[in-house]
Every structure is written in structure tokens, then in C-alpha cells.
Amino acid sequence: MALLRPELADVERLLAERAASPVATIPDLSSYLIAAGGKRLRPVLTLASARAVGGRGGEAVCKLAAAVEFIHTATLLHDDVVDDSDLRRGKAAAKNVWGASASILVGDFLFARSFTLMTETRDLRILDILSRASCVIAEGEVRQLAALGRVDLSFNEYMAI
């Protein structure tokens, strides 16, 4: 992890910069969740994977790592609304502070920012992979919602969710 510390600092800077908006609720709400920390596992894995395949790191990889973290944060915001969660990372869920609608819309904003970061890498493969992954995430959430309360799910159906 120490090897990635400089790049992780760049990712943190990008997260703060790209969560900015003249609409005050957006940076307030997004920074509430982003600043709550977390392990930053997804950016670490992104940076480490780039190194493992001989990548030099740099701005494009940091943008990709920030995009992945924004996607993750957006899904957390949406998930807390769908699951009616009261806590996230030991703090009140954003939906309990700003409301469900604001949480969903800021999650949408973070998804949009992630795609902006991806396009800035100028690598359509990244956009293709992460847009497909975002669809899989959304489909999984809808499957989970549709299966809510169903006790007749087969093991395979459960695992598909």
C-alpha cells in the first residue's frame, strides 16, 4: 500500500475536485460520504492492477481509480435509499440527512462524473467495461428488489442476485 500512497493522494484530490458543483447539495452530500473514508479498496485495486500489468500509473490511471470510487459511492447512496438503511460507515445515511431524493440525484451526479473521468482517459475500452459493469450492478439491485420477501428462491436465483 505504501507504494501506491502518492497515487492514492492524487485519487483523493480528484475525488474532492470532481465532487465540486455550484449546486451546494452535491458537494455537501458527496463529501459527507467520501470523507467518511472507507478502505478505498477499489482505487487500490485499480492502481495495483495497472502496476501489475506494467502500467506506469499517472493521471489516466488515477482518473480511472477515481471513476471506480465514484461508481461505488453512487451505488452506496442508491442502496441506502432502496434498503432504507439508517447508517453508512458508522454515520447517519445520507438519505437521513438530506433526504432520499437528494441521495438518489447526487448518486446520479457521481455516476455522471465517473463517466466524464473515464472519457478523459481517451480509452473506449475503459468506458465499455465500466458502463457494462454499471448495468450489471443496476440489474442486480433490481433483481434484489424484485426478490424481496420471496422465500421460494432457488439457490441459483439467490446467487444470481
Put a short name on every predicted segment.
Residues 101, 105, 113, 137-141:
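Mid-bilayer segments of alpha-helical transmembrane spans in multi-pass integral membrane proteins
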Residues 41-42, 106-107, 126:
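Hydrophobic (often cysteine-bearing) scaffold residues that line and stabilize catalytic clefts
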Residues 126-127, 136-139, 144-145:
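Short, well-ordered, mixed-charge alpha-helical segments that flank or form enzyme active sites
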Residues 115-134:
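Transmembrane helix-loop-helix
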